[in-house]
Structures are given as C-alpha cells and as structure tokens.
Amino acid sequence: MQIELKRLQKKLKITFVYVTHDQEEAMTMSDRIAVMRAGKILQLGSPKEIYERPNCRFVADFIGESNIFHGKVEAVNDKLLDIATENGKLLSSGEGFLEGEDIFVSLRPEYLSLSKTALPGFDLRGRVKDFVYTGSVTKTSIEMADGSEVKMSRVEDNSEFKEGDTVYLSWDPPHSVPIHSSGEGEEEHET
C-alpha cells in the first residue's frame, strides 16, 4: 500500500502531507521528513539525511536504532575528533567541535565492527552478551564496562566470536555523527 500511494503521488504530481508515528512508513513514503517534538520541528530533511546525519540526540534515538556514546573531545585534527568516553577512546568525524567540549556520538548498529584487538584511535572494549540471527542479519549485543549495551547489526554472522568473548569496537569515523550536548542541538527549524 505504501508503494502504491507513493506511485499515485508521483503520477498525480501533488504534495501529500502524511502524519505518522511509524518510522518505516515515514522513511518509505517520504521525500522529506520533519521530526517534531513538543510541536517544534527538530530536523527537516530527506529520509537518508534524517537517518544518517541526525542533528540531535532525540532524532538519533527516534529514527531507527542508534548507539549513543557520551564523551569529551580530547583533540581536533582537521575533521577528525579524538573523543574520550567512560568506556574508552573513539574517533568521529565532524566540524564545529572544540577540544574539551562535552558531546554525544551517534552510531547506527550496521556500521559497528568487532575485533579481537584494539584498532588505532579506538580502545572501546566490551563483552559479547548475545547473538540473534534474524535471517537477513545477525544482531549482536555487547555489554560495556559501565553496564551500558551497544547493538550491532550485520549481514556477517561474526562466527569468530562467541558469547562472553572480550571484543573491541570500531567503525569508519565518517559513519558516526557527533552531536553537541549543550541543548543537544534541539533548536527549532524554520520551514
């Protein structure tokens, strides 16, 4: 039905305003999405922009599944941020951040990688809690030292790891999204 409505909208060349709480429906049917909270638009953009580059923690948590790391910027090297968290160091890519700034980093589960040793710039270590095979992907839960849980969702089965193994987390820095923590970037947008 969603695809048929999208085809009809294109055929008739009219604008649809569609209100939904179903994220998959919004992503499937929309050219542009407005994520709202308390009557204010927090982010306006294409489904891809909203999903891959959330501008605040609320949007990162609201649209899809996201791992959120809280930390402090230790160094800024061009667009690469060295960030210290309670669970170790990580790298992210972003502009407009200052050394010493308190930030959040959003990472979608499909971008997370596991290894048996720490990779340069990363020393986030956790323990494999469990695996769930869903057919198309394997979902992995990793328990961090502070008790928080990080989610990974990959096509690969990670058969080299088993429950209870110590693993190191990493990702390609441009796949993570740094978010200012002061006000969490939740300014309203003009439409």
Regions found by a protein language model. Give the residues of each.
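Non-catalytic connector elements of ABC transporters
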Residues: S66, V76-T191
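Solvent-exposed, non-membrane alpha-helical residues enriched in polar/charged side chains
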Residues: K6, K48-Y51, A60, F104, ...
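Residues located in well-ordered beta-strands
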Residues: S46, F58, K72, R125-R127
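Elongated periplasmic alpha-helical coiled-coil
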Residues: T15, Q23, F62-K72
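Short acidic/glycine-rich beta-turn/loop cap or linker motifs at sensory/regulatory domain boundaries
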Residues: A38, E74-A75
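ABC ATPase nucleotide-binding domains
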Residues: M1-F58
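Glycine-centered loop/turn positions within well-structured domains
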Residues: E24, K48, R57, F69, ...
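Short boundary/loop segments of OB/S1/cold-shock single-stranded nucleic-acid-binding domains
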Residues: S46-G64, P109-P120
